Amino acid sequence: MTRTEAFWDRHNTRMTDPEQARAFAAELASIRTVDTIVNALDEHRAAAGLSKAALARAIGSDPSVVRRLLTATTNNPTLSTVAEVAAALGLKVQLVPMTDAERQELTEPMLGTTHAAETTGAA
């Protein structure tokens, strides 16, 4: 068995545990959301012809804040920073419903343990 196959075997075994599935889905949702937002902000910044330093000046921030937001491989930006950068680019942060496939992959595992506890009277 290759390392990749072993990884996916372990992963699939862990996902049979509702709490592990919930934690994985929550982390996956967080990563995807941050990636989507950061990539969209950087694409709009580039399309507007703004440097990261100019964008930082537009939000009254140190250039390192924008640089870290748009280039860090591990980042968890604050909502207020995202909202300010979005506004400076003529954008607004908005929540939209997930597709059925996204809900099945993310929402259902996250609610699975909570919903089961509520329906059995445990909690």
PLM region spans:
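N-terminal flexible/basic segments that precede or flank functional cores
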Residues: 1-39, 104-123
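Residues at secondary-structure transition points
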Residues: 24, 28-36, 50, 72, ...
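Short basic helix-loop element that most often maps to the first helix and adjoining turn
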Residues: 39-56
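Helix-turn-helix DNA-binding elements, focusing on the entry/boundary residues of the two helices
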Residues: 41, 52, 63, 79-82
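Recognition helix of helix-turn-helix/homeodomain-like DNA-binding domains
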Residues: 60-76
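DNA major-groove recognition helix of helix-turn-helix/homeodomain DNA-binding modules
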Residues: 80-95
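Short amphipathic recognition helices of helix-turn-helix/homeodomain-type DNA-binding modules
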Residues: 96-106
